[in-house]
Amino acid sequence: MKDNYRWLAPVYTPLSRMVFGNQLHEANTCFLSNIPNKKVLILGGGDGWDYRGFQDNLTGKFVELSPSMLSKAEKNLKDSKLHFVIGPFDFKEKYDVILLPFVLDTFNDQDLEIFFSKVKDSLNSGGKVILADFFPSQNWRQELMIKTIISGFRMLAGHVRQDLPDYEYFFRSIGMEKVEEKIWKKGWIKAQIWK
């Protein structure tokens, strides 16, 4: 499998913190205090750095397409009870919580439709999805930054999107409802719980 993040893995978290401070970390983790004793699925969790403070509560799977990122995640989350998996996820098990940390903007809309139907089928009764991602920009600076980020990931990591998906449309299309939301940068960065 080609490792599109090989060059990004060593600098991903430091670069993120340099540009956004602690805001992406906060978005990724703001709802995690509610998941003890839950079976979780983390899809595209990168180097796992954000989840280190919660690893005692993490049981389930951590799925990542990049071998470089997965290797870092295994080290960063060595005390968790997560099973680390490289490659596309097969959605054969059921989970209480599915985490989607800044990953959905790597899919085109057709793939998102398929992906979301599988997400819904992978949730236990009463299960929830926690999304953290960028949303439509609120000013020209954010617009310029998101275009730069998207272009950079297209060039360096082979992402296919040229814009941000309409996440809420896809959640609603599978009958899910947003039950909680936290925002940063006037709503440009959001964390949401969907059930």
Regions found by a protein language model. Give the residues of each.
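Conserved alpha-helix/loop element of class I SAM-dependent methyltransferases that forms part
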Residues: F20-N37, W49
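Class I SAM-dependent methyltransferase SAM/SAH-binding core
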Residues: L41-D90
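A conserved beta-strand element that flanks and buttresses the S-adenosyl-L-methionine
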Residues: L99
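A short His-aromatic
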Residues: D105-F107, D111
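A short glycine-rich, Lys/Arg-flanked "PGG" loop and its adjoining helix->strand segment in the class I
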Residues: E113-S125
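C-terminal alpha-helical "lid/dimerization" subdomain adjacent to the S-adenosyl-L-methionine
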Residues: A132-I174, E180-W184
